[in-house]
Design a protein with these regions (language model features):
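Glycine/threonine-rich beta-strand-loop-alpha-helix active-site module
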Residues: 1-74
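Alpha-helix C-terminal capping segments
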Residues: 20-30, 150-152, 162-167, 186
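Glycine-rich phosphate/pyrophosphate-binding beta-alpha loops
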Residues: 39, 142-175, 256-261
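Carboxylate- and glycine-rich phosphate/diphosphate-binding segment that chelates Mg2+/Mn2+
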Residues: 47-151
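Flexible, glycine/charged-enriched surface loops at secondary-structure junctions
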Residues: 103-111, 125-136, 151-156, 209-212, ...
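C-terminal catalytic subdomain
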Residues: 154-214, 220
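C-terminal charged capping/lid subdomain of soluble metabolic enzymes
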Residues: 204-282
């Protein structure tokens, strides 16, 4: 295996696969990443997520970062609305979790804030078929990737990794379901930063408590506007199956490296509370 160049072309999973292949093969060939969806930011990150059976394995290493990223809006013209909704919420979640990370810093904060502001503004129009805004959303995805590659992510991604592998629900869709509940859970530790993001996106709120509420409600409203499921039950995970596996889910979430940079220390009860909010009714 002695390639002159490796090209990762596709969505987040395809790019992660190519990145892992290059990493484990030990090749010195440069890796060029060309994303065809606006979501993962994998074209600029040190992360790759691999799935084996019912487990997702997040890999983190600087050697996973591609040498070249190419953003071409032509790949976005014919994306189906459902895919735009799923991947777009991944952008929003990357930006929010990077901005509120316990490892956040000035430069990644600037990247994350701009990524969130742009994605929140552009996602509805992109979903509705406006191809002119899709490059802006594409760039927001890359900015969010640059931010979380430095700052890390949080509980929402940790839970999405575990639930996605177990119930085979698309990653971005899970983020959309989980994110408002995770914001409520993390609010005591990150209220001020959530409020800043709300104001950056034009959601207002003179007091931090009001701005945080506006952020959560704005995300719930956007989720509905994009025809995304509101609960795990609506996404196809039967509540009885979720509750039967709760112990295993909690254990796996606590072991996910994304928990290390959550703004608050992640505890067993916190994960259970989020699950209760997002599972849906029997």
């Amino acid at each position: 295996f002695q390639p002159d160049l490796l090209v990762a072309l596709g969505g987040g999973s395809a790019m992660d696969c190519a990145k892992a292949m290059a990493y484990f093969s030990g090749t010195k060939a440069p890796l060029a990443a060309i994303p065809t969806t606006s979501g993962s930011g994998s074209e600029v990150t040190d992360f790759a997520v691999l799935t084996h059976g019912q487990t997702k394995y997040p890999l983190v290493d600087k050697r996973l970062r591609p040498d070249l990223a190419i953003l071409d809006s032509d790949f976005l013209r014919n994306l189906p609305p459902a895919l735009i909704a799923d991947t777009g919420f991944d952008v929003l979640t990357h930006a929010i979790e990077a901005y509120t990370s316990s490892n956040a810093g000035t430069i990644p904060d600037l990247l994350a804030q701009e990524a969130f502001r742009t994605a929140y503004a552009c996602l509805p129009a992109s979903y509705a078929g406006n191809t002119e805004v899709r490059l802006r959303l594409h760039m927001a995805s890359t900015l969010a990737g640059m931010a979380f590659s430095q700052s890390g992510l949080g509980l929402c991604h940790a839970m999405a990794h575990v639930l996605g592998a177990r119930f085979h629900i698309p990653h971005g869709r899970l983020n959309a379901i989980l994110l408002p509940a995770v914001i409520s859970s993390n609010a005591p530790a990150a209220q001020q930063k959530y409020a800043r993001l709300a104001r950056a996106a034009g959601l207002g709120g003179s007091a931090d408590t009001i701005a945080l509420r506006n952020l959560k409600n704005g995300l719930i409203r956007l989720r509905k506007d994009l025809s995304l499921p509101q609960t795990l039950s609506q996404a196809g995970a039967a509540p009885a199956q979720v509750w039967a596996a709760t112990g295993e889910i909690v254990e796996a979430v606590l072991a996910d490296p994304c928990c290390k940079t959550n703004p608050a220390s992640v505890e067993d009860f916190q994960i259970r509370r989020v699950l209760e909010e997002v599972t849906g009714h029997f």
